[in-house]
Amino acid sequence: VPELERLIQAHQNIVFFGGAGVSTESGIPDFRSVDGLYHQKFKYPPETMLSHTFYEQHTAEFFDFYRQKLIVHGAKPNAAHLRLAKLEREGKLKAVVTQNIDGLHQAAGSKTVYELHGSTLRNYCTRCGKFYPVSFIEEAGGKGDGVPRCTDCGGIVKPDVVLYEEGLDEAT
């Protein structure tokens, strides 16, 4: 840690690359550890349930799993998120590049965040493009088949996250 602090103090153009390990202290499990999603038992493997094909062919089951396992309630930014936001305010950190989909970097105050795999906080209609908050996905769980549908056109409202079999957003 002292060496890391020395490097931080000596440099002004830092970019942080991070993933699931950053948010585990906030109570968000990663995918691959012993307690992670991939080691839990489900009807299908998590990689299957989080694939584009599964989303298309088993939409209601996809959303049930998504609501239960990927939307996190009550998670707060931890010391790492807060330290990165502070470094950005100080002008040392130029960007955070993350694979996390939890929005905790922004909740901590980071402004320049590139979410390679998207965010559970953003959701959009696959037909008309209208955006919806995560609460819309949650509330749809208690209605009909549980599939969130656009209030304007009836299209499916999909989480703005990268599923298996999908490419990364080129804008990111």
What residue ranges belong to the model's regions?
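Conserved catalytic core of sirtuin-type NAD+-dependent deacylases
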Residues: V1-T172
